[in-house]
Amino acid sequence: MRRRAGAGARPRHDSFSILCAVSEILALIVLTNVHTAATGPPCRTTKAGVTVGRFQGLVGIALILGIIILFSRHRHAIKWRTLGVGLALQVGVALLILKWETGYEALKWVSDLIQKLISFTNEGVMFVFGGLVSEDNGFVFALSVLPVIIFLGALIGGLYYLRVIQVFVHFVGTALNKIMGTSKVESVFAATVIFLGQSEAPLVIKPYLSKLTRSELFTCMTGGFAAAAGSTLVGYSLLGAPLPYLLAASVMNAPGSLLIAKALMPETEESVASVNTLKVKDTESKNLIDAIGNGALSGGRIAVIVGCLLIAFIALIAMVSGGLEWFGSLFGFEGWSLEGLFGILFAPLAWAIGVPWEDAAQVGNFIGQKTILNEFVGYTSFGPAIPDLQPQSVLITTFALAGFANLSSIAIQIGSFGGLAPDRRADVAQLGMFALFAGFLTNMLNAALVGVIMGL
C-alpha cells in the first residue's frame, strides 16, 4: 500500500520562496543584458562560425523553470536538490560536447561507429528489394530509413539478451539514483529509455508498475515522452539531423525528465517499489537467435507504424493547408497553410529557446509539427531546410525535436503501461496530457541550455 509521507509536516517552501527563486533567475537575465550592453555587441561569432545572441536562451530557461514551479501539484514538496543536480547534469553534458573538443570527438567517434553499423543495413535491403535500391532513385524514405529501424531493433534485441545494455542501464540508473535522489525504479527507467524507447522500456519495470506511487508513474511517463531512443534516433539522423547532437540530446533527456517531472509532481507518498537491486533481463527470448528475431520484429512494428503515420499526417497537412489556402483566398489572403500557422504559434517559443528571430517562424513550424503530429514529421520537414538555417538554429532545433512528446504518444503509453499493469490504466490515461506537457518542456529545456552554452 502506498501512504503519504509527512502528511502533517509544515511546508518547507512557500509561495514567497518560489517567487524569490524565479526573481533571482530573472535578475540574472537583466544583469547579463546590462553587462552585454556595457561590454560589447549583443552577439558574437564562435570558432565554428556560429553567430549567437548572448544568453538569449536564458529567457527560455527562466520561462520553463517558472512554469514547472507555477504548475507544480505540490510546491512545498519540491526537492530542490533534484532540480539543481538535474540542471547541472544537463549543463555538464552540453559543455562536454560543445565546449570540450575531446568530448565532441569522442561523441563523433561513437556517431561514426553507428553510421558504419547502419551501412550494413544496405546488404539486407539490396537482397530483399534488389534493383529498387539505386542511387539513381535518390533518397527513398521507405528504403533508406525504415530498414535501419528494423536492423537496429534486431541489434538492440541481441545486446539486451547478452546483458550489454543492462550494464549501462544499471550504471546510469544507480548514478541518477544516488546523485539526484530519485527512486531506483525512476532512475533505471530514465536510463532505459535512452535505448528502448517509450513502448518497450516499461517491460523493464513491469514487476513494479502496480506498486509505483503516482509521482513515480508520472516520472516514468515523462521519461518516455521526453526520450528519443534506440532505432528511431538513427532514423532522425538519416533525415538530416546531426547524429552527435541527437546522441547528446538522448543522454540529456534522462536527468532532464527527472528534473521536470519531480518539480511538476513531487513525491508525497512513501515508495514501496524502491528496491535495492532491480534486475533487468530478457525473459521472453529462448536464446540469442530468438532475441535477435524478436528485436527485428519489434523494429518492424515500429517501422510500419512510422511509415503509416507519416503517410497519414503528411497527407493531412497537405489537405488542411489546401483548405486554409482556399479559405484565405476568399478574403484576399494568399499563402495560408498549416505550416504557416504552426510557425506563427510557436515562433515566440523558438526565439525564447535561442533561435534567431529570422529563423523563428520556420523552427516554430517544426516544433509544432513534432508536437501536434509526430517527431518524424518534424524531422522530415527540418532536414531539407537545414542548409537555409543558421548553424545555431540547426543545433537548437535538433535538440528541441528529439523526443516522443506528441499527441499520438499518449495512446502508445496507455497501451504499453496499461497493458502491463491494467490496474494503473486509469492513472496513465489521467496523467497522459500532463506527462506529455512535462516531456515537451524537457526537450525545450535541453534546446535552450545548448543555445546558451553555444553562446558562451
What are these regions (language model features)?
Residues 177-238, 363-449:
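Alpha-helical membrane segments and immediately flanking helix-loop junctions
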Residues 251-302:
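Long, contiguous bundles of hydrophobic transmembrane helices that form the permeation core
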Residues 108-119, 167-181, 193, 207, ...:
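Short amphipathic alpha-helical coupling elements at transmembrane boundaries
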Residues 170-204, 271-291, 338-342, 370-371:
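Juxtamembrane inter-helical linkers in multi-pass membrane proteins
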Residues 120-122, 127-182:
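Hydrophobic alpha-helical hairpins/lids featuring a short glycine-rich hinge
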Residues 297-386:
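Transmembrane helical segments that form the transport core of multi-pass membrane transport proteins
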Residues 95-128, 271-274, 320-345, 358-366:
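Interfacial/capping segments of alpha-helical transmembrane domains
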Residues 40-145, 290-293, 306, 310-318, ...:
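N-terminal alpha-helical transmembrane segments of multi-pass membrane transport
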